[in-house]
Structures are given as C-alpha cells and as structure tokens.
C-alpha cells in the first residue's frame, strides 16, 4: 500500500490553490454539501480570502502526487484554557479516495500537530444527518460537547 502523507497548505503555492478549489468543489457537489457545483468565480474568491485570513491553516492528505483530502481550519483562542485551538471548518475527501482511511489520517495528523504546538483542543461541527462523518469523528476520538451545544448562525449576505 502506498503511504499517505500530510502536507501543510501553502496558499501562495498555485498547485495547492487549484487543489483547494477542486476539493471544495467535490464537497459542494456532495449530498452533504449543496448538491451543485461551485459558482463561477467563487474559487478565486476563496483563495483570495484564505490568503488574507491570518488565522487560516490547512492540511492536505496526499498519496504520491495526488491531493486526496483537505482540512480547512482556523486557529482560534480559548479564553477558558488560555491557549490556542484548531477549528476544523471543512473536512473533504475526494470521491476516488473515500473509504481508504484519508479522513481518519487527516484527523490523526491534525491532532499530532495540535499536541506538538500546545493547542488545547480541536473542535468541528457536523450535520446532524451526516452519519458517516459522525462515525469517523467518533473513531478519531471526538464526541458531542457535554453539555451538548447548538451551532447557531445569523446570515449577513
């Protein structure tokens, strides 16, 4: 079996940027995304935004020369622990690489990175009906918050 490799995203690297857009589009096309392709021009806006977002950190799961998976994350700060934390905003595995351990690989490697850099926790959100993702997250040691939290939003667009 070929070895999986973790690569930190470099938003100044054009190959990385193309791979980010490609992988996000896979997510958008998925039933757990929006079920349709990325809007025209959205890829460039995403890359521009990531390049200008000082708290962005990303991780690719690669095999040979292929970008198989992506975790788009943000660094945040826990005032309760007085330490930084990682929020996983997107976790995407390309359709051709699903059910091959890339999701668990990324989560495990992000945890190693967080421990090595003295982060206090990793958090993420998951749709209530995304049972495959929930199973993966539980396998990686994640659990619902106790007490259970709600994720709320106020759309400004």
Model-assigned labels for residue ranges:
Residues 93, 99-112, 135, 139:
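Conserved acetyl-CoA-binding loop-helix of GNAT-fold acetyltransferases
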Residues 58-60, 66-75, 87, 92:
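Conserved beta-strand in the GNAT
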Residues 107, 114-125:
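Conserved GNAT acetyl-CoA-binding A-motif
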Residues 78-84:
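A short, polar/charged loop-to-alpha-helix boundary motif
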Residues 1-18, 22, 157:
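Conserved N-terminal entry element of GNAT/NAT acetyltransferase domains
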Residues 49-54:
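Short loop/turn motifs at secondary-structure junctions and domain boundaries
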Residues 104, 128-147, 151-154:
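Conserved active-site alpha-helix within GNAT-family acetyltransferase domains
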Residues 25-48:
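Conserved GNAT-fold acetyl-CoA-binding loop/helix
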């Amino acid at each position: 079996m070929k070895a999986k490799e973790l690569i930190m995203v470099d938003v100044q690297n054009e190959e990385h940027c193309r791979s980010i857009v490609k992988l996000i589009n896979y997510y958008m096309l998925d039933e757990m995304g929006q079920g349709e392709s990325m809007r025209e021009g959205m890829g460039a806006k995403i890359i521009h935004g990531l390049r200008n977002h000082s708290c962005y950190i990303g991780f690719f799961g690669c095999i040979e020369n292929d970008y198989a998976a992506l975790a788009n994350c943000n660094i945040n700060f826990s005032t309760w622990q007085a330490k930084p934390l990682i929020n996983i905003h997107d976790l995407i595995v390309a359709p051709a690489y699903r059910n091959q351990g890339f999701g668990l690989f990324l989560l495990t490697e992000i945890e190693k990175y967080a421990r090595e850099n003295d982060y206090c926790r990793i958090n993420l959100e998951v749709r209530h009906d995304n049972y495959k993702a929930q199973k993966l997250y539980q396998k990686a040691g994640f659990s619902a918050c106790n007490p259970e939290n709600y994720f709320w939003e106020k759309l400004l667009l």
